[in-house]
């Protein structure tokens, strides 16, 4: 089952699909978005593969996450940091920012 959490209702719904797939002995994958898919697939025993694209095809995955897990021997080792574990590359964000909006508290 190649389910996409961004189109199917989010990570919780994706895990519900994964639970149903277990009942029918169906392997799970995730369509695109390796920054989220890697964590979802690591959370189940019947995950199969992670789609990972060339940096020109998926520049956000390859550039905006400063501590992006590196692919080695076909595997990713995820961080132990809270949540998705991302540390954003502020310089990359600044490079492509259109404007900087500052809201003052009154």
Where are the model-predicted features located?
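Shared catalytic-loop signature of beta/alpha-barrel
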Residues: 1-75
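C-terminal extensions of enzymes
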Residues: 64-106
């Amino acid at each position: 089952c190649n389910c996409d959490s961004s189109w199917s209702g989010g990570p919780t719904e994706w895990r519900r699909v994964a639970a149903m797939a277990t009942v029918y002995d169906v392997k799970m994958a995730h369509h695109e978005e390796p920054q989220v898919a890697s964590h979802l697939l690591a959370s189940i025993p019947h995950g199969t593969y992670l789609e990972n694209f060339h940096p020109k095809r998926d520049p956000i995955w390859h550039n905006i996450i400063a501590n992006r897990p590196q692919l080695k021997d076909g595997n990713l080792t995820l961080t132990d940091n809270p949540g998705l574990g991302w540390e954003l590359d502020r310089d990359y964000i600044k490079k492509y920012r259109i404007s900087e909006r500052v809201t003052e508290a009154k």
